[in-house]
């Protein structure tokens, strides 16, 4: 089941998927009650074995300049809605004797990114929430892990490049090139590569992996 706020985009995404049985659920993650109602309709049709949390990032800017409302909005969209989704799918996972929860966050949980103050803050909170869940849910056979994408070719990265270009006088293409050169592999990541890491953590091969932060960043993060 694909879960997002835009029904047309969800339907278009389903058409690109192979196989049958794909469904959509529509909810606005700025409205937690929307999320609760939508996920209830999903679990009513059967248990959820795998939950992937992947919410778009908040607007950029320095941490000290952000309004408190921006922090509250980010925590609502990320942590609060993630919590509601977990609470909704947990009974089915426990009844099945296990499950997988994967949160797509950011390498900023290991190394804060300049100009993304609110995002850095909320991503760190989600990472600690997930680690806590891994400890709590392990006895139920449920693994909880985080995937940390680096500079990956997405609309979000284009947005960040355009914002930085407007401030520095560079072109967005020049900004993206500089980002790629800062990666040891000297290129940007692809969404499919992040998807591969998620698929691995949801596979039987990762049954004994829980509570980790897995960077998918071409080696850019400097910490161990």
Which positions does each model-derived feature cover?
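Substrate-binding pocket helix/loop in short-chain dehydrogenase/reductase
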Residues: 62-75, 101, 179
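Alpha-helical segment proximal to the catalytic Tyr-Lys
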Residues: 91, 135-136, 207
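Short C-terminal tail/terminal secondary-structure segment
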Residues: 111, 198-199, 210-224
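Short, small/polar-rich loop/turn modules that mediate ligand/substrate recognition or access, typified
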Residues: 138, 143, 209-211
């Amino acid at each position: 089941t694909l879960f997002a706020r835009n029904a047309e985009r969800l339907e278009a995404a389903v058409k690109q998927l192979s196989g049958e049985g794909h469904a959509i659920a529509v909810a606005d993650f700025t409205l937690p009650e929307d999320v609760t109602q939508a996920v209830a309709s999903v679990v009513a049709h059967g248990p959820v074995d795998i939950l992937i949390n992947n919410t778009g990032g908040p607007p950029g800017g320095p941490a000290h300049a952000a309004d408190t409302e921006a922090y509250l909005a980010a925590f609502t969209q990320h942590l609060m809605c993630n919590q509601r989704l977990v609470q909704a799918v947990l009974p089915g996972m426990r009844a099945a004797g296990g499950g997988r929860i994967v949160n797509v966050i950011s390498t900023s949980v290991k190394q804060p990114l300049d100009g993304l103050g609110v995002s850095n803050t909320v991503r760190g909170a989600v990472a600690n929430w997930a680690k806590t869940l891994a400890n709590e849910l392990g006895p139920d056979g449920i693994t909880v892990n985080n995937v940390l994408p680096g500079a990956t070719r997405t609309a979000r990265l284009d947005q960040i490049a355009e914002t930085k270009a407007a401030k520095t006088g560079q072109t967005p293409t020049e900004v993206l090139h500089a980002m790629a050169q800062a990666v040891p592999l000297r290129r940007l990541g692809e969404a499919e590569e992040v998807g591969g890491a998620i698929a691995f953590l949801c596979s039987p091969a990762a049954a004994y992996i829980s509570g980790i932060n897995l960077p998918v960043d071409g080696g850019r993060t400097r910490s161990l």
